[in-house]
A protein has these predicted regions:
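Short beta-strand/loop element within the Bergerat-fold HATPase_c
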Residues: 145-157
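Short helix-loop "hinge" at the ATP-lid/N-box region of the Bergerat-fold HATPase_c
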Residues: 138-139
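Short conserved segment of the HATPase_c
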Residues: 170-184
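Conserved micro-motifs of the catalytic ATP-binding
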Residues: 75-80, 119-122
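Glycine-rich ATP-binding loops of the HATPase_c
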Residues: 211-217
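Short alpha-helical segment of the dimerization/phosphotransfer core of two-component systems
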Residues: 55-63
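Conserved catalytic submotifs in the C-terminal HATPase_c
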Residues: 81-85, 103, 108-118
């Protein structure tokens, strides 16, 4: 029954949101109460307390923004705005925007592209969302050599974007589930590094609406996510 199924989805969604918000709310409340009660008047400790509150509030804000984006895409409230744009220029901009965060974690992002320009036909804003979520996911799970490689290749009329990060492979049994909302392969690590299990579900929603391929491949020394774009000349 469709009504029963929708109620189950709604209940599961609310349960997941409540679970995700519980930890940051508890941390914010605990550290705010500590500041109010004057547990420490040491400036360094007070600065640390304030830092935790700001970080956790930022995580909640980020999660709410992603949920709103996902809701708009899944329920068809946002139409694709198709246009021709340079995917190399877009990726260069996104990589530059993420270099500071990556370097703070000792991670190097490499985007060594031979082609200076590759035009694609898509919704530039949505594709920016896809690339950003892939790179964010790579930063959150990068390990071992601490390296992320972004590359673009032409495959017939399509253009494929790859985002590879060194680190642990995704267990094969988890791969079909990683595109689901709130799904986390390594819950302890995800909490530590700031993931919320929503980014890849946004990728899936966008690529499904666009009708192009996307996926993930385990490599010998890491994991590679990819997606395809229309590279045919359009007027």
């Amino acid at each position: 029954d469709r009504k029963v199924k929708m109620e189950e989805v709604r209940t599961e969604f609310l349960s997941n949101v409540s679970h995700e918000l519980k930890t940051p709310i508890a941390l914010i409340q605990g550290y705010a109460e500590g500041l109010k009660e004057g547990i420490s008047d040491d400036p360094e400790s007070m600065d640390f307390y304030c830092g935790v509150i700001i970080d956790e509030a930022g995580k909640m804000n980020n999660m709410v923004k992603k949920l709103l984006t996902l809701n708009q895409i899944e329920f068809g409230n946002e139409e694709l705005v198709m246009e021709r744009f340079d995917i190399i220029e877009l990726i260069t901009s996104i990589v530059n925007a993420n270099e500071l965060r990556a370097s703070q974690k000792g991670i190097q992002i490499e985007f060594n592209q031979r082609d200076e320009h590759i035009d694609v036909w898509s919704d530039e804003y949505k594709i920016e969302e896809v690339v950003t979520n892939y790179i964010t996911n790579a930063i959150n799970h990068c390990d071992f050599e601490n390296r992320i490689e972004v590359s673009v290749e032409r495959i017939g009329d399509d253009v494929r974007v790859h985002v590879f990060n060194t680190g642990k492979n995704i267990p094969e049994e988890d791969i079909p589930n990683i595109w689901q909302k709130f799904y986390k392969v390594d819950k302890a690590r995800t909490r530590e590094y700031g993931g919320n299990g929503i980014g890849l579900s946004i990728v899936k929603a966008i690529m499904d609406s666009y009708g192009k391929g996307f996926g993930v491949i385990n490599k010998s020394n890491g994991v590679e996510f990819w997606f395809d774009l229309d590279g045919k000349a359009m007027v």
